[in-house]
Amino acid sequence: MAFYRRRISPIPPGQPIDYKDVDLLRRFITERGKILPRRVTGLTAKQQRQLAVAIKRARIMALLPFLNLEG
């Protein structure tokens, strides 16, 4: 019988994901500016949805780029 280690979310479950926290949001996007999938980030489904909304809001407010074509 296999035992699976429970994955720990990189963001505590009670901590809000704010679109103004650019340093936090940058940890979950690629170098090209794409949102990383849940299997890579290790977030819960609810946190991943909140993260996607926060990143999209930050892009609209020009806090994050839509595309990062540098480098």
UniProtKB/Swiss-Prot annotation:
PROSITE patterns: RIBOSOMAL_S18 (PS00057). Keywords: Ribonucleoprotein, Ribosomal protein, RNA-binding, rRNA-binding. GO terms for biological process: translation. GO terms for cellular component: ribonucleoprotein complex; ribosome. Binds as a heterodimer with protein bS6 to the central domain of the 16S rRNA, where it helps stabilize the platform of the 30S subunit. Part of the 30S ribosomal subunit. Forms a tight heterodimer with protein bS6. This is Small ribosomal subunit protein bS18. It comes from Thermosynechococcus vestitus (strain NIES-2133 / IAM M-273 / BP-1).
